[in-house]
Every structure is written in C-alpha cells, then in structure tokens.
Amino acid sequence: MDKLIITGGARLDGEIRISGAKNAALPILAATLLADGPVTVGNLPHLHDITTMIELFGRMGIEPVIDEKLSVEIDPRTIKTLVAPYELVKTMRASILVLGPMVARFGEAEVALPGGCAIGSRPVDLHIRGLEAMGAKIEVEGGYIKAKAPEGGLRGAHFFFDTVSVTGTENIMMAAALAKGRSVLQNAAREPEVVDLANFINAMGGNIQGAGTDTITIDGVERLDSANYRVMPDRIETGTYLVAAAVTGGRVKVKDTDPTILEAVLEKLKEAGADINTGEDWIELDMHGKRPKAVNLRTAPYPAFPTDMQAQFISLNAIAEGTGAVIETIFENRFMHVYEMHRMGAQIQVEGNTAIVTGVKALKGAPVMATDLRASASLVLSALVAEGDTLIDRIYHIDRGYECIEEKLQMLGAKIRRVPG
C-alpha cells in the first residue's frame, strides 16, 4: 500500500486547477443508462471510484470509450446483463445509483448491497421505498437488492424522504425520469450535485424542475436521447486546497471552480482571518502569513456547512488561535481522524457529536493512518504545518476522492512525496 511522506513548514503559494466532482460524476455516469443512444460525459476526475463505475459498465456488456482527457462515451443499448456484482460494488457505495436507472430503463436490476467508507449506517432503505412507491417489486436476499418494474413500467409517485438523502434523491429522480406520469419528491436533497444530475437528465430530454430546492417535480418522458455533458467542479476539493493554504499562512488561487457552491465554507475561512477574492470560475485566498483564528461550525445539509469539509476545519482549528467547537449532525463516527491527530499533538476533545478543538502553536510530525476519505485529507493538512516528517499510511482512502493530491500540493510548494508500500 502506498504511503505519503510530508515534511511540514512550507507556506503554500500558487495556482491549481480543480477536478470534476466525483459526487456529481458518479450519479451522472449511472444516469447514462437511461439513454436510448450514446452519451458523452466530460471533466471526469481520475479517481478509483470513477474507474470502478466504468468497469461496472464493462461487466454489464457496455463498452465505454475513454479518451485521454478522461471523457467517456457510453452506449447503454449494448447492455447484456442487469447485475451489479458484489466484487465491484463492495468498494464503492455509489454503485447503488445504478438501481433506479436500470429498473426504469430495462425493467429489472440486481445490485449488491454497497460497501465504501465506514461512516455511520447510511441505509439504502430510502432507495428501496422510493422505487416501491413507483410500483417496483423488491426483494433483498443473499446480499443483493433484486428489483422488478411492474408491467407497463414504473409509475410516477409522490415520495417524502423522512431523512434528507443525496443518493436517495438521485436514485429516485433518475427512475422517475422514465416513469409514466408525474413524480414529486419532497424533503429532497438540495446539493449542487443533485442539480448537476438534473441538468444532465434534462440535457438528454428529461423534464425535471425544482432541483436545488426541497421539492423536485419530474414529469416522466418516453425516452431520453444522446447528449454531451461536462461534470461540475468539485467543491470539496476546492475547499480542501483553500484550507491547505489557510493552515500554512499561505496564498492559493483555485481555478476551474465555482464560488457560488461553496459559500458556507468561504464564510468560515473569512471568519478565520483569510482574505478571499472570487471571480466567475476562480477563488483566491491569502492569509498574509497569519495564523488562523479558531471557528465554530455545525454541519448540515446544503446550503449549510458540508460534512465533507468538517475534518479539514478540525485541522485548521488544531493550529489556530483560540478554541473552536465542531458539531457533526450528518454522520455518526465521523471523528475517527481525531485520534490520529492526537498523535501529532492536537488538543481535541470529542463529546458525542461535538469536537472541541483548542489550537496549539505547532503540531509534531508522526506516523498516522488514514481511516476514511475526508479524515485522511485532514491528516495531510495537519502534516503540512507539523514540525518534521509525517508518514500517512492507507492513503488509498485519499485516492478515492482527490486526484493527484501530492502533485497538486507540490505545485503549491509543499514537501510531499508518495512512496510505494
């Protein structure tokens, strides 16, 4: 297994380009299964989960055509099997996203129960109940979800999400795109990635309104056609590099991004003392060599502060002036990185769903281990400001969400290298 070795102390300075958003790319790739012709999706990030999804299509008999810029063409008409096998699904929770499109387009699907990050319980029952509301018959047996559409296909339905679920909203929205009649999804997720998926389906000829609000209305159409679509930028990658510059007292300009989908994070960075300027597709942050001030924050569904940026701000608070409380309301077990940060000298107390972080002047390099995707990013940020060397093990977690993290950080002046395990 690869490891990262980071020598702390370098002040980051420079410009980088932001990759496409994994959390938009995965549902958009799943939605290509709805089309009645070839679909091209561009600006895909070079990540393990993306290649797993493309490999899953290959297993189903579809032959994706990939160019060197990681734009992919998929023609779902060549599908031969409607099974998403466990050996692929177990490494990637997002594979549940093929369930809705396959039942809607082909009338049946068999998808293994998913794997992925070990955060909280993340139930799939909302996906199942939503499809059942549209008339699907579903059995869960032998670790597989087996779904069949009723004769004549799925029917539009009114469905209320009793908890806000991003993938649940996406799965039911995709299924509803080809269902007969109108579907109304209430208490739907409002994330920008949901909006991106709706825009993609509409680009294929779908009729979805209200994405980005908590009520989405979908009028099913008879068929969806070919389209060419570019995935939105990754707001979490954007935020992570902004925090990296902030913790080191440095300056960064992130390009090919969208400041409007990161407002809660930018507000907290300003509160921490950062100077921030934005343009249509760029954000510039400058700390002018200052140590950040600790901030209080509470994670909540979009447009509030994103849970996927929580760990990065614990790193910021760990070396900030003062004390900050971080309250996690989305997932349980999301403070796993705290115990690794203790090894570096961070002063963090966890009480239930709250981490109280008292900033110290300096962290110390230490061997640490990544536990999940965003937690591992926080260890990288802490290592950038720690005295001496930090060795981060199990970085396959990082590679699931960050494209070429060491190369991008090197471009900003970080002393970081990957060593084979």
Curated annotation (Swiss-Prot):
CDD domains: UdpNAET (cd01555). Its EC number is 2.5.1.7. The modification 2-(S-cysteinyl)pyruvic acid O-phosphothioketal is found at C117. GO terms for cellular component: cytoplasm. The active site is at C117 (proton donor). UDP-N-acetyl-alpha-D-glucosamine binds at R93, R122, P123, V124, D125, L126, D308, I330. One of its GO terms (biological process) is regulation of cell shape. It catalyses: phosphoenolpyruvate + UDP-N-acetyl-alpha-D-glucosamine = UDP-N-acetyl-3-O-(1-carboxyvinyl)-alpha-D-glucosamine + phosphate. Pfam families: EPSP_synthase. Its main location: cytoplasm. One of its GO terms (molecular function) is UDP-N-acetylglucosamine 1-carboxyvinyltransferase activity. Phosphoenolpyruvate binds at K22, N23. Belongs to the EPSP synthase family. MurA subfamily. Cell wall formation. Adds enolpyruvyl to UDP-N-acetylglucosamine. HAMAP family: MurA. This is UDP-N-acetylglucosamine 1-carboxyvinyltransferase. It comes from Pseudomonas putida (strain ATCC 47054 / DSM 6125 / CFBP 8728 / NCIMB 11950 / KT2440).
